[in-house]
Amino acid sequence: MIEADRLISAGVISDEESIDRAIRPKLLAEYVGQPHVREQMEIFIQAAKQRGDALDHVLIFGPPGLGKTTLANIVANEMGVNLRTTSGPVLEKAGDLAAMLTNLEPHDVLFIDEIHRLSPVVEEILYPAMEDYQLDIMIGEGPAARSIKLDLPPFTLIGATTRAGSLTSPLRDRFGIVQRLEFYQVADLEHIVSRSAKCLGLELTPEGAHQLARRSRGTPRITNRLLRRVRDFAEVRADGAINGDVAMKALDMLNVDAEGFDFMDRKLLLAVIDKFMGGPVGLDNLAAAIGEERETIEDVLEPYLIQQGFIQRTPRGRIATNHAYKHFGITREE
């Protein structure tokens, strides 16, 4: 079982990119949720435009699926400049980054996703580029090698990461603007899914939007994915319109419950409750009990359950909370 196999995965599934681009907001006025981020970015962008400067470098971090790429696109659109996109793992050599930097136009935005995965060699190239708009290149080899400096046009680097703690201090300190994206409120997700339905030409009632939003784990990417799957159900089993009843039936069929849990979430929680009397249980024992690798539990399954208060990590192991017992209608034995 891997994260990409799950309907409620916050990661990108292979065929979603083109659809996501079509429904993605283009401007801050269309951007829903994250009010503190929206207000701050509106001020920073307006100030940069008034001065005729490039926007300061921006670091965006937070869980996957919350709109880091969307925000980078919006910044480029609001600034009226080009967006060049790449990712940390793709930039294997210093020359890969140098090629992108030397092709930038003044004030362009360079977006590096998964920036925490940059190699140290590539990261070193970024320091003078971000700070002084200069590129240090080594010419030649051995004793004859020499360094030359190339001037770069003023540009904005936007780095995105799900692991801000993995960034080195020198890189993190060079970002003048740092934005953390939080999980979305249900009301915001209702607005997002209603807008997406309109973009896709779907009939979605407010109650249908609510059912989709409340099961989306606070994540717009999951909301939009569930919308597409519920659309399929509505076209085959109903008249094509998505109301509350159709949405509930479709999501129940898809095995996504009222908390946004799928079968893997429930399997883990019930293992702690039934097999280990609510815990504490060590990670290795829990992994063996549900037939998963410990890394899958730690990196994929647990974070949302902990964030929502269904599981607690303690020095002695994992414990199911009263919230978890209540979810399954199980009375906790004292």
Swiss-Prot record:
The name of this protein is Holliday junction branch migration complex subunit RuvB
Q: Where does Mg(2+) bind?
A: T69
Q: Note the superkingdom of the native organism.
A: Bacteria
What is the organism of origin for this protein?
Answer: Yersinia enterocolitica serotype O:8 / biotype 1B (strain NCTC 13174 / 8081)
In which residues is DNA bound? R294, R313, R318
- Show the GO MF annotations: ATP binding; ATP hydrolysis activity; four-way junction DNA binding; four-way junction helicase activity
Q: Which NCBIfam families match?
A: PRK00080.1, ruvB
Q: Where in the cell? A: Cytoplasm
Q: Which Gene Ontology terms describe the biological processes this protein takes part in?
A: DNA recombination; DNA repair
Gene assigned in the entry: ruvB
Quaternary context: Homohexamer. Forms an RuvA(8)-RuvB(12)-Holliday junction (HJ) complex. HJ DNA is sandwiched between 2 RuvA tetramers; dsDNA enters through RuvA and exits via RuvB. An RuvB hexamer assembles on each DNA strand where it exits the tetramer. Each RuvB hexamer is contacted by two RuvA subunits (via domain III) on 2 adjacent RuvB subunits; this complex drives branch migration. In the full resolvosome a probable DNA-RuvA(4)-RuvB(12)-RuvC(2) complex forms which resolves the HJ.
Q: What is its EC number?
A: 3.6.4.-
UniProt keywords, alphabetically: ATP-binding, Cytoplasm, DNA damage, DNA recombination, DNA repair, DNA-binding, Hydrolase, Nucleotide-binding
Which HAMAP family does this one have? DNA_HJ_migration_RuvB (MF_00016)
The ranges of region (Large ATPase domain (RuvB-L)) come to 4-184
Q: Entry's Gene3D superfamilies?
A: 1.10.8.60, P-loop containing nucleotide triphosphate hydrolases (3.40.50.300), Winged helix-like DNA-binding domain superfamily/Winged helix DNA-binding domain (1.10.10.10)
